[in-house]
């Protein structure tokens, strides 16, 4: 998105009551974070920069310490380690948190997922090492590809120096209220039981929980669920080809979708998605490692001469006015412009539905050519 859209989003988020703006980049390219941090500072919000945690020989303790210093220097109010795949094991959590606390004065938050089964233990060691905040989920929505359960962590820290002071009885009431929603989601098929258990392949293939869900969904649509393990094995190979980025939105979708194509087509990169091409062209930012030159040649060909090394948004013209002009017929509040900027088709469908509810006219059945609007 152009800088003016990012700035407007931050402005309206804070105006509508959001206290903390968590800002991250799928490549940990600091250049892509500065606009949002500056906008948050301007609006007197809390700018939290999240570094996407991953494994690989480039992601050393020195790397994380250097990144933490750069995050503090850019004006962030706190630092979050975003372990979207549940790759951070307990012993490494101790090392990482201690290193971060030594390299920055910012509060450090840890966000992980239970996908690999180690998250609760990781939180215990991280808290003992000095982490300031941990992210949890109420028990009906916890575990699997989600976070450790809030109630469990509260009980684990009870009567210790890390006692949260939260009332377990009140937390249980909240859990009881939401538990039927979980059962409904399971019964309807909205929630796939495959994402509820422990998947040790997360540690083998470094695949985040949300990415696992997407892969299952993509293969199910193609009737190729039997290719699941094969696709999982292809993911780290594609990731390495694309400069070894952390697997988080949108890089996780890019790598995952390309892995699916590589397996289903029977030939690697026989079909390359637009997003794969864009990441190789530098349109998402700078990766920590170089791309596989053979893949670059196969996917881009002569187009590789158009690759960029600057901050991608530097090449984008301001677009807020243009976006507002496109959707002005639907605008009822400032936030509508942002909805359209982020999700143009979904937002347009919603605007039409909202209009139909307000006027009693269903735009889908209207004969706009002859001016007939049935009610």
Where would I find each of the regions flagged by the language model?
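Catalytic alpha/beta core domains of metabolic enzymes, predominantly
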Residues: 84-270
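Terminal or standalone catalytic/regulatory effector modules within metabolic enzymes
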Residues: 192-202, 206-375
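Alpha/beta enzyme core
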Residues: 1-110, 123-131
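Helix N-terminus capping/helix-initiation residues
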Residues: 2, 60, 149, 167, ...
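Phenylalanine-focused residue identity feature
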Residues: 9, 24, 141, 157, ...
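Short secondary-structure transition/capping segments
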Residues: 32-41, 66-75, 90-104, 124-134, ...
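Histidine (H) residue identity feature
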Residues: 46, 111-113, 353, 373
């Amino acid at each position: 998105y152009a800088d003016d859209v990012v700035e407007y989003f931050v402005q309206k988020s804070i105006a509508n009551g959001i206290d903390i703006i968590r800002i991250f980049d799928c490549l940990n390219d600091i250049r892509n974070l500065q606009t949002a941090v500056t906008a948050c500072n301007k609006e007197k919000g809390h700018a939290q920069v999240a570094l996407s945690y991953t494994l690989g020989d480039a992601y050393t303790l020195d790397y994380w310490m250097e990144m933490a210093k750069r995050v503090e220097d850019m004006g962030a109010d706190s630092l979050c380690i975003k372990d979207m795949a549940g790759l951070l094991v307990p012993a490494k959590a101790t090392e990482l948190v201690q290193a971060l606390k030594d390299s920055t004065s910012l509060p450090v938050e840890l966000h992980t997922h239970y996908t690999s089964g180690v998250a609760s233990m990781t939180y215990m060691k991280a808290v003992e090492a000095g982490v300031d905040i941990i992210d949890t989920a109420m028990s009906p929505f916890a575990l699997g590809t989600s976070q450790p359960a809030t109630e469990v962590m509260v009980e684990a820290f009870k009567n210790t120096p890390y006692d949260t002071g939260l009332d377990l009885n009140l937390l249980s009431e909240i859990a009881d209220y939401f538990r039927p929603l979980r059962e409904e989601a399971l019964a309807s098929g909205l929630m796939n039981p495959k994402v509820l258990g422990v998947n040790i392949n997360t540690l083998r293939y470094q695949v985040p929980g949300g990415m696992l869900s997407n892969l299952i969904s993509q293969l199910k649509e193609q009737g190729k669920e039997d290719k699941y393990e094969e696709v999982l094995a292809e993911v780290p190979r594609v990731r390495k080809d694309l400069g070894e980025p952390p697997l988080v939105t949108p890089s996780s979708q890019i790598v995952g979708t390309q892995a699916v194509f590589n397996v289903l087509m029977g030939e690697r990169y026989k079909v390359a998605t637009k997003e794969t091409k864009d990441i190789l062209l530098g349109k998402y930012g700078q990766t920590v490692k170089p791309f596989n030159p053979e893949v670059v040649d196969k996917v881009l060909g002569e187009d590789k001469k158009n690759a960029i090394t600057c901050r991608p948004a530097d090449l984008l013209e301001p677009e807020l006015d243009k976006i507002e002009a496109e959707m002005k017929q639907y605008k009822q509040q400032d936030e509508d412009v942002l909805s359209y900027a982020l999700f143009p088709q979904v937002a347009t469908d919603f605007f039409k539905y909202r209009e139909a509810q307000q006027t009693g006219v269903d735009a889908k059945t209207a004969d706009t050519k002859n001016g007939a609007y049935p009610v």
